[in-house]
């Protein structure tokens, strides 16, 4: 199942998919997120969340290790070459109850310690190099190619030299927590007529859909939302 589509014509798009199960009133809506996009994408997602009854949202607790791992996209905001913003959705403004089954600061710290000192040092070296390269020479087209690779289940392209260690910390361990939360919601509320939104990075959606499928949920509706166009708009004042 495709969650992020990259084409010349439509740019980068995210597939918002609704799942339901026969005999159950509960519906899940998955929102595959990209952490760097046009403001309109995040505004559209935020607006849609108002119609939900419960949200399942990602968000690793703040920690030095977490900041190091997320620096690759955080420091690309403000780049005039990309003209994109970091994901921001004000859940308190949305006003819908939400849960955050993600890594705690202590869990990130423990996972970071399991990675060798050599690899940790390389991360701190390579992420800034990647950021500088993207700010100086990067384009939306380059970023789109990276997102097409991430669609296959990889983590941040700046960390691709260390797939095993970092996949476990930033992907698989978080997937397990997310899947556990989905199972709990199904078990406790499957007979309620509610709409549950799952707002997580697109790389986590393979685990989400696999869990929903095993529980008997099937897609019943889907639509594309544009994350960003490949070619940014040109200002007539330039």
Where are these regions (language model features)?
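Short, flexible loop segments at boundaries between secondary-structure elements
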Residues: 205, 209, 213, 218-238
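Structured, acidic catalytic/metal-binding patches in enzyme active sites
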Residues: 1-173, 184, 221-232
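Beta-strand elements within well-structured catalytic alpha/beta cores of enzymes
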Residues: 195-200
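Active-site metal-binding loops of divalent metal-dependent hydrolases
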Residues: 34, 202-203
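A short, acidic, amphipathic alpha-helical segment used as a generic capping/interface helix at domain edges
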Residues: 173-190
């Amino acid at each position: 199942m495709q969650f992020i589509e990259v084409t010349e014509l439509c740019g980068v798009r995210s597939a918002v998919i609704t799942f339901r199960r026969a005999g159950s009133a509960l519906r899940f809506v998955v929102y595959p997120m990209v952490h760097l996009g046009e403001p309109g994408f995040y505004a559209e997602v935020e607006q849609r969340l108002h119609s939900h009854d419960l949200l399942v949202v990602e968000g690793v607790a703040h920690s030095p290790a977490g900041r190091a791992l997320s620096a690759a996209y955080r420091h690309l905001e403000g780049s005039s070459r990309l003209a994109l913003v970091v994901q921001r959705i004000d859940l308190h403004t949305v006003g819908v109850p939400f849960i955050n089954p993600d890594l705690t600061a202590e869990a990130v710290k423990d996972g970071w310690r399991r990675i060798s000192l050599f690899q940790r040092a390389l991360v701190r070296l390579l992420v800034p190099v990647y950021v500088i390269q993207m700010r100086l020479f990067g384009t939306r087209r380059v970023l789109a190619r990276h997102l097409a690779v991430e669609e296959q289940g990889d983590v941040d392209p700046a960390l691709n030299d260390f797939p095993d260690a970092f996949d476990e910390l930033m992907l698989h361990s978080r997937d397990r927590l997310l899947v556990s939360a989905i199972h709990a919601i199904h078990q406790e509320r499957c007979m309620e007529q509610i709409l549950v939104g799952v707002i997580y990075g697109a790389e986590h959606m393979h685990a989400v859909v696999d869990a929903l499928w095993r529980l008997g949920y099937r897609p019943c509706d889907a639509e594309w939302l544009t994350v960003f166009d490949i070619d940014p708009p040109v200002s007539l004042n330039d």
